[in-house]
């Protein structure tokens, strides 16, 4: 199916209708209600206490839902409660993870307070992320938004309808980028909407990215999964997964275009034991450049620690702390739209650093049966781990000493004639074992006969 036919078909869908209903001039004619399905043992008064602002309104529920006996409810029956009567929780969101410099701004746009992980964000807050800084926000319905570097957003609406699970979330993105993972929006007033200087977006459960230019407010939207309804200057479009759209202030929306496929990452180990960490990917047809992101995984949440645009199909990092990471790479087309992610999870474990091997030197040859192995002092090392093998993969171990006191830094072994490989790892005072050093090889030749 072509992008054009997909758009025409989707415009008739319910999501775009929801967007239009929410827009000015399209007010709902009937009062919205939320439906509660009766469970065994439920009483009408208990339902009212749990979900209504005024528990005494259970009598009104009895009348509007035609309930003969408020203490004897039929399991499975739906009790309709006017949305206007529903309890509302506190209007807030949570700063789940902050990386770098993230600030609350006052009405004049000046920073007034730093945002840290665990902070409560309130309706009306304007938040700004600095360079190489990100913020992950969790909303009342468990939807999440990753705010990328050099961005500014305002939390316009954070209505929380308590135990119903419904939330009415509206965010203004003034500049920069966001990456949203939206929980399925169930219920008549459950909404997740984003507005920018060029575009209004509404979703009912999806994953999508937006990027707003700081200069003119032009907005690029890329849908990763689900559907997103867009509206600008009276024109509407539905953007399906795998499609994106460019919106410019004062201009009607064009048709969504297909995003680039994900590039193919080269084969690399999931464990990086020695820096630099190097990655390559196949050149992608239609990609002028590539977005390269390194995400640190902290308590199950992603923090973007590197966000670069590259002209090359390779990247490397000379310094990365030990930890779990995800690499994301996607192509950027001629209109600036970014395609599907190629993703790789990996772990960096380079510390404590191994010592430098001293004797026997690499590729040394000797006729001595007894061989002394020596190495240098390594930072953070209290003790050392030693291995001697007949093969470079260390599958056939000749000797393995799990812990050697750091004051020694030497071991002695008698070995028969043959080629050998040896290596050493550092152990900290807490028992943390680092990666092994690069192996040295040596050959012990048979002694010449007299």
Language model features with spans:
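Extracellular LysM carbohydrate-binding repeats and other cell-envelope/extracellular binding modules
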Residues: 30, 50-90
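Surface-exposed, short loops/turns at beta-strand junctions within beta-sandwich domains
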Residues: 317-324, 412-419
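Primarily a LysM-type cell-wall glycan-binding module
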Residues: 27-52
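Short beta-strand segments within Ig-like beta-sandwich modules, predominantly Fibronectin type-III
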Residues: 305-311, 400-406
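Extracellular fibronectin type III
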Residues: 335-348, 429-444
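Conserved aromatic anchor
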Residues: 277-286, 371-381
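Flexible, surface-exposed loop/linker segments and immediately adjacent secondary-structure boundaries
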Residues: 74-78, 82-275, 387
């Amino acid at each position: 199916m072509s992008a054009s036919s997909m758009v025409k078909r989707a415009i008739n869908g319910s999501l775009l209708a929801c967007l239009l209903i929410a827009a000015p001039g399209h007010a709902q004619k009937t009062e919205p209600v939320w439906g509660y399905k009766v469970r065994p043992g439920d009483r009408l008064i208990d339902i009212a206490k749990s979900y209504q602002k005024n528990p005494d309104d259970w009598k009104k529920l009895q009348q509007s839902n035609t309930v003969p006996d408020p203490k004897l409810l039929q399991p499975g029956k739906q009790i309709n409660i006017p949305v206007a009567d529903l309890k509302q929780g506190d209007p807030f969101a949570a700063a789940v993870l902050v990386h770098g410099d993230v600030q609350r701004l006052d009405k004049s746009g000046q920073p007034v307070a730093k945002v840290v992980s665990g902070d409560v964000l309130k309706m009306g807050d304007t938040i700004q992320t600095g360079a190489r800084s990100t913020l992950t926000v969790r909303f009342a319905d468990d939807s999440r938004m990753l705010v990328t570097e050099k961005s500014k957003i305002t939390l316009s609406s954070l209505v929380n309808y308590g135990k119903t699970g419904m939330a009415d979330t509206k965010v203004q993105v003034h500049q920069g980028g966001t990456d949203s993972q939206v929980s399925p929006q169930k219920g008549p007033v459950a909404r997740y909407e984003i507005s920018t200087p060029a575009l209004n977006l509404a979703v009912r459960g999806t994953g999508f990215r937006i990027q707003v230019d700081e200069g003119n407010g032009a907005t690029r939207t890329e849908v990763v999964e689900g559907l997103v309804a867009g509206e600008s200057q009276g024109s509407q479009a539905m953007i399906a997964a795998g499609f994106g759209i460019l919106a410019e202030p004062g201009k009607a929306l064009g048709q969504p275009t297909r995003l680039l496929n994900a590039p193919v990452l080269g084969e690399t180990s999931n464990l990086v034991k020695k820096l630099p960490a190097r990655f390559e990917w196949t050149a992608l047809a239609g990609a002028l450049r590539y977005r390269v992101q390194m995400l640190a995984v902290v308590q199950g949440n992603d923090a973007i620690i590197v966000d670069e645009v590259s002209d090359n199909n390779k990247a490397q990092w000379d310094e990365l702390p030990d930890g779990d990471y995800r690499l994301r790479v996607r192509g950027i087309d001629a209109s600036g739209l970014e395609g599907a992610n190629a993703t790789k999870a990996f772990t960096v474990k380079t510390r404590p650093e191994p010592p430098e091997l001293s004797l026997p030197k690499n590729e040394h040859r000797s006729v001595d049966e007894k061989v002394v192995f020596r190495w240098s002092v390594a930072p953070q090392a209290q003790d050392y781990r030693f291995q001697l093998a007949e093969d470079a993969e260390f599958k056939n171990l000749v000797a393995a000493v799990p812990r050697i006191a750091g004051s020694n830094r030497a071991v002695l072994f008698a070995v028969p004639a043959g080629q050998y490989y040896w290596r050493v790892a550092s152990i900290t005072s807490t028992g943390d074992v680092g990666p092994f050093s690069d192996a040295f090889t040596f050959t012990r030749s048979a002694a010449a006969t007299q």
